[in-house]
């Protein structure tokens, strides 16, 4: 079989490319996905409130584990990644957060990335989005991905937690993806008007899969990329349970969109990466590229949990006898508790003056439970997810064998810098000040976790070591740039090779301030225009907030 383009990975970026490239009817595209379909009747992936379920199994989750993390009491930590049409947009928390404008302006200051400023990228965020309250300078109204905004009548804890953040002296913002990210406000979410998860399989592939010039093969595990000299010419993949590779060929390009864990792994198996590593596994070196699999970054977060004095939390919804009614309302009406991810309030703040833009993120949740659905507190409660945004810690992804079914060695090196510890100590102490504000007086019960006895730097550090978890935002392992550790250029083209691009979160040179999915989709949209030889969308002229010399916070209502 031969196609113009072969896309490896039907995830947040791969589905964007498959859809945009097949808009040109004379172009043929093959989309290979190692997982299966996104079954529309499976509530585990389609119901927003069920977001913890896919992380508990392996049907939709690669369920990677890290090597023992040396600064986290040698814990092996979860690294869930999506498997199936939609990729990680099929199993993520559905928070529609783009990051801060300064993240992209910061990328664009690096040599070779001048066309990645916020104003260059904003048109591509808008192109991908249909926001339920309509378009404006920051938001789209006719894109493939449905975005739902918060509505009146949602859980009263959201408004109370946002108000508490403002009472603690921080700004209020009405749109975390608009003029000003900094502050506390409502969070948009990847949910359709009918209350379904808005993955890229639903938003993009539902349109594209009707086209005769797109072929999708699921249960297709990529073994390696095929090369002739320095040119990528095809892909060898394993279909279903077969161990016999099938080869397909690309007339124009191979587009690697397998994500921050699998993309470097596939490159390494294919002979592209650090030559010393490849030689350990007798892999013929196609191109010695030392940055492949390096520069791994993530967001680490922890939960501060509180009992709730008013019976308004989601605790009753965790009981099996209440779930049939919730499920029926969601299934037939697309409304009710099932139709939300329940991350409807949050914020971004600067913990210290030295940060030019926010370095701490909050998600508020009106129940006390682990992200993966474990360890639910048997009482009405609420929690703040809080974590640092741009850790200086760096890790790596490295193959352990040539076997495409064997997971790679993943090490994030979480908390390897003093800055990490300072940010988390600050975050816990600031969160306690926020929770102590008058807006939460009628809701706030005792602190369940970490517990009021946890006060000294040493006690806080030990809590973080034992309890902090991934926010599931790995990136950076095939970074864009022009330095010796860069893997791709500003259009995703792999340095030193022809006919091969990487287009996914692995090309982010620096992690962004917030959840990754919206920006990964934007990357797909932007590079799709490069691949098609189209003139980039005109730069936006929208204004955006820069803190400058403004203080980090004002006077709290209650110290």
From Swiss-Prot:
The reaction(s) this protein catalyses: choline + A = betaine aldehyde + AH2; betaine aldehyde + NAD(+) + H2O = glycine betaine + NADH + 2 H(+)
Q: Which GO terms describe its cellular component?
A: membrane
Q: Name one GO molecular function term.
A: betaine-aldehyde dehydrogenase (NAD+) activity
Q: Which cofactor does it need?
A: FAD
**Matches recorded under SUPFAM superfamilies:** FAD-linked reductases, C-terminal domain (SSF54373), FAD/NAD(P)-binding domain (SSF51905)
PROSITE patterns attached to this UniProt entry: GMC_OXRED_1 (PS00623), GMC_OXRED_2 (PS00624)
- Catalytic-site annotation from UniProt: 473 (proton acceptor)
UniProt keyword annotations, A-Z:
FAD, Flavoprotein, NAD, Oxidoreductase
What is one Pfam family matched by this protein? GMC_oxred_N
Q: What Enzyme Commission number(s) apply to this enzyme? A: 1.1.99.1, 1.2.1.8
A GO BP term here is:
glycine betaine biosynthetic process from choline
Q: What does the record give as its pathway? A: Amine and polyamine biosynthesis; betaine biosynthesis via choline pathway; betaine aldehyde from choline (cytochrome c reductase route): step 1/1
Give the binding site residues for FAD.
Answer: 4-33
- What is the role of this chain? Involved in the biosynthesis of the osmoprotectant glycine betaine. Catalyzes the oxidation of choline to betaine aldehyde and betaine aldehyde to glycine betaine at the same rate.
Q: Which family does it belong to?
A: Belongs to the GMC oxidoreductase family.
User: What is the recorded name of this protein?
Assistant: Oxygen-dependent choline dehydrogenase
This chain's source organism reads Cronobacter sakazakii (strain ATCC BAA-894) (Enterobacter sakazakii)
Q: Which taxonomic lineage is given here?
A: Bacteria, Pseudomonadati, Pseudomonadota, Gammaproteobacteria, Enterobacterales
């Amino acid at each position: 079989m031969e196609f113009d383009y072969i896309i490896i990975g039907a995830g947040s970026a791969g589905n964007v490319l498959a859809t945009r490239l097949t808009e040109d009817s004379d172009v043929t595209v093959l989309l290979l996905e190692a997982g299966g379909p996104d079954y529309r009747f499976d509530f585990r992936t389609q119901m927003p409130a069920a977001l913890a379920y896919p992380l508990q199994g392996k049907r939709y989750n690669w369920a990677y584990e890290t090597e023992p993390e040396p600064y986290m009491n040698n814990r092996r930590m979860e690294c869930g990644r999506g498997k199936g049409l939609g990729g990680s947009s099929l199993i993520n928390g559905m928070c529609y957060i783009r990051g801060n404008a300064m993240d992209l302006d910061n990328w664009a200051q690096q040599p070779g990335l001048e066309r990645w400023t916020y104003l260059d990228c904003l048109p591509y965020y808008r192109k991908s989005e249909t926001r339920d309250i309509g378009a404006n300078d920051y938001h789209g109204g006719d894109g493939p991905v449905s975005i739902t905004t918060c509505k009146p009548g949602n859980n009263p804890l959201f408004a109370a937690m946002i108000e508490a953040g403002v009472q603690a002296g921080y700004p209020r913002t009405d749109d975390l993806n608009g003029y000003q990210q900094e502050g506390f406000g409502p969070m948009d979410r990847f949910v359709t008007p009918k209350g379904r998860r808005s993955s890229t399989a639903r938003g993009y592939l539902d349109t594209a899969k009707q086209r005769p010039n797109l072929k999708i093969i699921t249960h297709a595990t990529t073994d390696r990329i095929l090369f002739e000299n320095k040119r990528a010419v095809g892909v060898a993949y394993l279909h279903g349970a077969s161990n016999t590779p099938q080869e397909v060929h690309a007339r124009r390009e191979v587009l690697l969109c397998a994500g921050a864990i699998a993309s470097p792994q596939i490159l390494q198996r294919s002979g592209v990466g650090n030559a010393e590593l490849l030689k350990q596994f007798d892999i013929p070196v196609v191109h010695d590229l030392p940055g492949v699999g390096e520069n791994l970054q993530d967001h680490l977060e922890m939960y501060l949990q509180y009992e709730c004095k008013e019976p308004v939390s989601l605790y009753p919804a965790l009981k099996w006898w209440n779930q049939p009614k919730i499920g029926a309302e969601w299934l037939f009406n697309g409304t009710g508790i099932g139709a939300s991810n329940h991350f409807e309030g949050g914020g971004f703040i600067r913990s210290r003056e030295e940060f030019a833009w926010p370095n701490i993120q909050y998600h508020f949740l009106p129940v006390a439970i682990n992200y993966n659905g474990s360890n639910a507190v048997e009482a009405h409660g609420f929690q703040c997810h809080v974590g640092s945004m741009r850790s200086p810690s760096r890790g790596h992804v490295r193959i352990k064998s040539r076997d495409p079914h064997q997971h790679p060695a993943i090490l994030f090196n979480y908390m390897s810098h003093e800055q990490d510890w300072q940010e988390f100590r600050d975050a816990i102490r600031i969160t306690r000040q926020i929770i102590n504000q008058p807006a939460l007086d009628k809701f706030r019960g005792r602190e369940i976790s970490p517990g009021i006895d946890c006060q000294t730097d040493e006690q806080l550090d030990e809590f973080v070591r034992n309890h902090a978890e991934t926010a599931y935002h790995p990136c950076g392992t095939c970074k864009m740039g022009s330095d010796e550790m860069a893997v791709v250029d500003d259009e995703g083209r792999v340095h030193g090779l022809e006919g091969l691009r990487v287009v996914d979160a692995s090309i982010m040179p620096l992690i962004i301030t917030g959840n990754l999915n919206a920006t990964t989709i934007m990357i797909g949209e932007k590079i799709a225009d490069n691949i098609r030889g189209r003139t980039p969308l005109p730069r936006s002229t929208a204004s955006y907030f820069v803190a400058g010399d403004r203080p980090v916070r004002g006077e709290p209502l209650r110290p």
